[in-house]
Structures are given as structure tokens and as C-alpha cells.
Amino acid sequence: MHILIDVQGYQSESKVRGIGRSTPAMSRAIIENAGEHRVSILINGMYPIDNINDVKMAYRDLLTDEDMFIFSAVAPTAYRHIENHGRSKAAQAARDIAIANIAPDIVYVISFFEGHSDSYTVSIPADNVPWKTVCVCHDLIPLLNKERYLGDPNFREFYMNKLAEFERADAIFAISQSAAQEVIEYTDIASDRVLNISSAVGEEFAVIDYSAERIQSLKDKYSLPDEFILSLAMIEPRKNIEALIHAYSLLPAELQQRYPMVLAYKVQPEQLERILRLAESYGLSRSQLIFTGFLTDDDLIALYNLCKLFVFPSLHEGFGLPPLEAMRCGAATLGSNITSLPEVIGWEDAMFNPHDVQDIRRVMEKALTDEAFYRELKAHALAQSAKFSWANTAHLAIEGFTRLLQSSQETDAGQAESVTASRLQMMQKIDALSEVDRLGLAWAVARNSFKRHTRKLLVDISVLAQHDAKTGIQRVSRSILSELLKSGVPGYEVSAVYYTPGECYRYANQYLSSHFPGEFGADEPVLFSKDDVLIATDLTAHLFPELVTQIDSMRAAGAFACFVVHDILPLRRPEWSIEGIQRDFPIWLSCLAEHADRLICVSASVAEDVKAWIAENRHWVKPNPLQTVSNFHLGADLDASVPSTGMPDNAQALLAAMAAAPSFIMVGTMEPRKGHAQTLAAFEELWREGKDYNLFIVGKQGWNVDSLCEKLRHHPQLNKKLFWLQNISDEFLAELYARSRALIFASQGEGFGLPLIEAAQKKLPVIIRDIPVFKEIAQEHAWYFSGEAPSDIAKAVEEWLALYEQNAHPRSENINWLTWKQSAEFLLKNLPIIAPAAKQ
């Protein structure tokens, strides 16, 4: 049996109410107790991405991403606005299409009567569908109190329409016998379709022994006295706060003085003023009523534990979570003797007539003055609350699902196709939809066709596709893309994509056609679907924050946004970067921290730096709670990086010069941090001392090195002992590596340092600065130097040569390095790739 649980009750405005508590608690219990049955959840993709993150966080310890389905539709759909009615109907159809493609046996809707004020979307089909719909009934309070709750014509229409749908449910699971009886008495639902599964509260509600410091902090935070009476509710007529205040005012003065009333209510200013005026009319001072405002769960649990008495005078509940929460925390609990509350409280002496303020006063006064009765209340609270558990509710629900399927005729799996066809026809007939709505729905329907899509692994080469500047980062992009295309990824179509500002992601098929064998078609827009993976290997800082919209959109469709982070040096040492990079990098990394699923760094050093930066900036960066930061190492085999070819005209002369004297090579774009100036000055010292050494600098001119480059162009040793080679091919670079005495890598900061690995692959010894990332990669297999004086490098070269002549120098060939194929494989291990065998 495959159970699909609609968890929108944890996304909507109900999130801060009882439904918001019971939705994750009940669904998690079903997952935990499902045994051999498969359980998935259905999430509404029209809510903000932070909302979706919260839902996924609530289940990530129990479900894989494969069992978290996000349905797409076009917002806004709130029924309260008549202009949304067409989109609302279309969203219901889109949800049906999503469910048909998920193909569950049971669709379990924990909260049904929603969608009037936000994008909550739920419906029960009137036609035959290949799944059974089971709805939870929390209460029918609006139906039983029409004058109070259904006075607004728009809401009345909405509620009555939902009620008509509700009556089509294959089964109703009520959270109390009282709620079940309401369904049987006041709807057309037969009693054999109604089951009481009860309810419960989380394990976090418990008796806790708080420290004196914690108690004092609560007192300070909420202006609490040493002892107090507690009540909890929303401000609405059925919660009966007026009667509670009236009854409290009738208590003897000494009890009022000793036990102020703490009202854990979230109130608007005008509501607060009205209640305080009411209290004053009963002779109460404002100091006798303490309003806490909204409470965190931790603080609420603490107040339950610390209160002298908890009182719940509600006129109508479907279940009544607050009394059960209070009793689980050991609080002496009193409540109304009507609707569902007798089932929860379970002791007649602890209840009162909520319509009779004298009766409320009587029971409160007895609890506060009769010590024996008070002790019984405390003991009863723990005994009674122990009868309720989410595990019991889950077992009852699963038994109900099983009986429902056993008593039903088997459905034709082919009906899923007919559901899609009929819903598409229905959408076409909705006149209220604009052309923009219809275009959005077309994308939504495509996204909701989960099973029809082969998963996609999409390599973002947004920079490379526009221009290959042949930087180290672009070598990474070329190499990773090449390996993934060559090797493939089981269960995924591998392709390249790019983003152009002001547009959307498109396939980089023209780039592929010009660089790889085969025909790839046109650069069509990308449809991101569930479980697709975007991996951005390029540095795209210049595209943020605009790209955030695309990232959130793909993630709301169930895809994953993953980014390779090469380094964050512009954040740590901004003086090493041009002004544009200094401006873009904080925006870029903060956006990645808040919106990406995975940050995959090119070294452990970079990963630690990224984590530290995010932690340091939490005052303005709000990290995605689902995000992981990991690392892999880059490859180094030039032959597999789609190398450039060709030899310069003076190749033989250069190679001859290299062979004529000990030659040292530096590789990389010339930038202030790379250490070229210090290295050149070091060799000038050595040349002045008469040392016959060559220095080969391989790399084009970068940012803020104009004076250095001018010096190189006019250096007296240029093309004698000093050689500056720009824009050479990978083929010729390999020749230089093979003939050099050692690589000098003097950079003050790197994310990884490909030249180090490329040198190791050629068994070329390395002389490097002792920065963390180099130590991570080279370990003891390199000769290290520190300091920023020319003499520091000159000394290191001399010391290394002495060791070299004794054949005692560190051996770079012992450095562990990866091929690009291996690097791509390690990258895949850091991605949310689903093995084909796991696909349902």
C-alpha cells in the first residue's frame, strides 16, 4: 500500500495553530509505523521556498527526497478574491494530475477546509480516480455555528463548496468521538465511513525540572509572578475568554492576589484593549492579567510546567490539544465539559459548564484551595495524558486505510492517464484564465508529470558557454562536463545548460555541438522537474541575485540546485580582487547559502572557510536549513580536460633554454596574490649572486599587475634567464612541466591549485607556500616556504636544490591526485543522485 499524505496543513496559516502541530506529528507517526507500506508526502509548491524548506526539514530524517513530492500550479489561488477562482479550480486539477502521476493507493488529507485566504489547494474528485481519499475531520464548528462563522457570503460559499467535496471522501478519520459524531449527524456521510482515530501531542510536552536560571529568565521575559493560572487560546468567541475573565473576577481577592491570570494569547492591540476594558468592568486591575503574546514551543512547555493551574473554558473543540499538552507537562488541568473535552480531560470533577461562570469559578477555587483535590488533579493529568499517543493514532489510521482498500474494487492503473486527460480538458474550459496563467499551467502540468520524465543532471556552464577564457575554473568546467557526458550517470540524462540575464535556463546545445561529437539540437528552455540536479561548475557571481528566482523556481519543482565553490578569497582578502568581484562575492555567497541545496567545495580548506563565513554572517545571512557543505578534489590529467593543442613557433628554442640550466616554472594567471613579484625578486637576488637558474612564468596578465608586467617586458634577463609565456596551449604546457626542474607555487591563497596537481602528475617536484590548502593536498611531499620577502623564496630554492642534488628532495609523485574521471565520480557522490534501483 502506498500512502500519500498531503501536508499542506504545515504550510498554511494553520501552521501556528493546532493543525500546524498535528500535521507533522500525525504524518510522522504514520511513516514511523507504516511497516512494509510506502509513505510519501505531498507539498504545495506555490508557497515560498523557505516554507517548502521547513516542510522538508520536518521529514528529512524519515523520508528520502524521492518520497517528497511537490506539486506545481499557478498562484494566487486564495478563494476570498473572486479573480482567483479560475486559478483555484485549475490548481485543483493540477494537483490531481500530480497525484495521478505519483500513483498512490491512499491520499490522506490532514486538513481539508483551507484555501480561502492563501494558496492551499485540496479537492476530492467527483469522478472515478485510481486512489482513495481519506480526510481528517478536526471539527465542523463553522457548520454548527453558521451565524458566527459563515456570515461572509464569500466564505460561506467557499465552506459549503468544500463541505460538498468533503462528503465525497472515501473515509473520514475524526480526531475525537465528538468530531466523529458531528460528521455522522450533520453531513450526508454514512457512519461506516467515519472512524475515530483520536489525536495526541508530541513527546516534547513532558514534565521538566527547570533550573533556577531558566525560571528567572522566563519571569523576566514575560513578567511572570512566582505562581499563576495559565490559559491558552486564540482570540475568538468559542474560546470563551470573556467567561474565564469573569469567573476569575469572582474568585476571592486573596486568590486573585496570589495567582494572577497569565493568558498565552496572541492578541492585536484593539483586542487587548477590549479585553482589558472588560476586565476592568469586572473590577480587575490590568496587572492581574498578563498577556504573553506568541510563545515559542520551548517557552510554552515551560509555562505548562510552571503554572499552578491550567484552565481551558472552550465552548467547542474538535479535540482540544492545549489541555492534553498541559496534562503531559504535569499541570493540574481544568476544562469544559462539552464537545470533545471530556474525552481529553477524562474526569468529571476536573470539568465545568463553560456557559456558567459560577461553575467555572467553583472548580477553579476548589483546585486552588483543596490540597487533596489539587494533588488528584496533578496525578490524574499524567495518568490520563498517557492514554494518548501518536503511535496509537497512526496504527488506527493504517488499519483504517487497509480496511478501506480491502473493501474497495481494484482500480485500473490506466485511469491515471484518463485523470490527466480529463483535468487538461477541464483547464481548457476555464474562461477566467489569462494567457499567462495558461502558459504557467502548461509548465506546472509538465512538472507534475513526475513519472514521465527521465531525471536530468544539468551542468551549468553559463560562463563557459559564452566565452572560454581558459582560466583554471573553466578548465574544471570543461573537464567535469566532458567526463559526465562521456561516462554518463545511470538513470539521468546529462546535458549542459546556461543562464542569460533576463531570461531562463536554456540547454547549451550549440556549445555541445561545437565541442563534442553528435547532434544536440537547439538551445531550448529547461523544464526542471522532480529530482533533477543542477550542478554549477562555473563561477557565476555576476548573475546574482537575479539567479535566485530561477533557483527557487527549480527547487519548488523538486529539483536540486548545487554549486561548486572554488574559493572565497575575495571575501577574505578583498584587496586581491577587482572592485566588481568585491561587490559581487558577498551577494553571491549569501545567495548560495540561503538558496542552494549543496555547496561542493574544491578542497576541505575551502569547505571549512565557507562554513566559517556563513557562521560569521548569520546576523544577515539566513542559511537554507537543508543545505550541506562538502568537498571533493579536482582532477589533473590534461589529456582528459579537453586540452588545447599547438606549439609556439619558438618552442624548440624555449625547450633548449630550459634544458641548458636548472629551470623553475610558475603556472597561473598573474594576479597580486599569486606571488610572481616576490618570486621574480628572489630570482633577481640569485642572478646577482651569479646563479645560473631560469624562471619560466606561464600565465596571462591579470588584474592589478600592470607595473609588474611592464617590468617583465623590459627586464634585462627576458628571454635569457627569464621567460614569460602567455596563451600557450595545454600541449606545450605539458612539455614544460616535463622538462622543468621544479614548480614554484608562491600563491598566498587558493581554493585548490591545479598546477600543483598537474606538476605532481608529471613527477615534477614542487616548492610551495605553506598555506592550508597546499598542506591538505601535498602533505609532506612538497618543499614548503613561508614569508613574503624575496630572500624567503631564494633560500627555499637553494635548500631544495641542495636536497635535489642528494636525491633527498620531497617526491611530488607521492601526492595523491585524481584523474578528471575520478574527480567527476567524487563530485557525483556529493550530489543528490538517486540510484536507478531506488526509482519506484
From Swiss-Prot:
It is an enzyme of class 2 (transferase). It is found in: Cell inner membrane. Keywords: Cell inner membrane, Cell membrane, Glycosyltransferase, Lipopolysaccharide biosynthesis, Membrane, Repeat, Transferase. The keyword Transferase applies. Residues 2-399 are annotated as: Alpha-(1->2)-mannosyltransferase. Its EC number is 2.4.1.371. The alpha-(1->2)-mannosyltransferase activity of the N-terminal domain is regulated by the activity of the C-terminal alpha-(1->3)-mannosyltransferase. The relative concentration of WbdA and WbdD is critical in determining the O polysaccharide (OPS) modal chain length. OPS chain length increases with increasing concentration of WbdA, but the maximum length does not increase beyond the wild-type modal length, despite substantial increases in WbdA concentration. InterPro entries: Glyco_trans_1. One of its GO terms (molecular function) is glycosyltransferase activity. One of its GO terms (biological process) is O antigen biosynthetic process. GO terms for cellular component: plasma membrane. It is a peripheral membrane protein. Its main location: membrane. It comes from the Bacteria. Residues 456-829 are annotated as: Alpha-(1->3)-mannosyltransferase. Pathway: Bacterial outer membrane biogenesis; LPS O-antigen biosynthesis. It catalyses: [alpha-D-Man-(1->3)-alpha-D-Man-(1->3)-alpha-D-Man-(1->2)-alpha-D-Man-(1->2)](n)-alpha-D-Man-(1->3)-alpha-D-Man-(1->3)-alpha-D-Man-(1->3)-alpha-D-GlcNAc-di-trans,octa-cis-undecaprenyl diphosphate + 2 GDP-alpha-D-mannose = alpha-D-Man-(1->2)-alpha-D-Man-(1->2)-[alpha-D-Man-(1->3)-alpha-D-Man-(1->3)-alpha-D-Man-(1->2)-alpha-D-Man-(1->2)](n)-alpha-D-Man-(1->3)-alpha-D-Man-(1->3)-alpha-D-Man-(1->3)-alpha-D-GlcNAc-di-trans,octa-cis-undecaprenyl diphosphate + 2 GDP + 2 H(+); alpha-D-Man-(1->2)-alpha-D-Man-(1->2)-[alpha-D-Man-(1->3)-alpha-D-Man-(1->3)-alpha-D-Man-(1->2)-alpha-D-Man-(1->2)](n)-alpha-D-Man-(1->3)-alpha-D-Man-(1->3)-alpha-D-Man-(1->3)-alpha-D-GlcNAc-di-trans,octa-cis-undecaprenyl diphosphate + 2 GDP-alpha-D-mannose = [alpha-D-Man-(1->3)-alpha-D-Man-(1->3)-alpha-D-Man-(1->2)-alpha-D-Man-(1->2)](n+1)-alpha-D-Man-(1->3)-alpha-D-Man-(1->3)-alpha-D-Man-(1->3)-alpha-D-GlcNAc-di-trans,octa-cis-undecaprenyl diphosphate + 2 GDP + 2 H(+). This enzyme is specific for the E.coli serotype O9a O-antigen. PANTHER family: GLYCOSYLTRANSFERASE WBBK-RELATED. Belongs to the glycosyltransferase group 1 family. Glycosyltransferase 4 subfamily. Contains two separable and functional domains. In vitro, the purified N-terminal domain possesses alpha-(1->2)-mannosyltransferase activity, and transfers multiple mannose residues to a synthetic acceptor to create alpha-(1->2)-linked polymannose. The C-terminal domain shows alpha-(1->3)-mannosyltransferase activity. Monomer. Interacts with the C-terminal region of WbdD. Interacts with WbdD via a surface-exposed alpha-helix in the C-terminal mannosyltransferase domain. However, the C-terminal domain is unable to interact with WbdD in the absence of its N-terminal partner. Mannosyltransferase involved in the biosynthesis of the repeat unit of the lipopolysaccharide (LPS) O-antigen region. Catalyzes the polymerization of a tetrasaccharide repeat unit containing two alpha-(1->3)- and two alpha-(1->2)-linked mannopyranose residues. Extension is terminated by the action of the chain terminator bifunctional methyltransferase/kinase WbdD. This is Serotype-specific mannosyltransferase WbdA. It comes from Escherichia coli. The gene is wbdA.
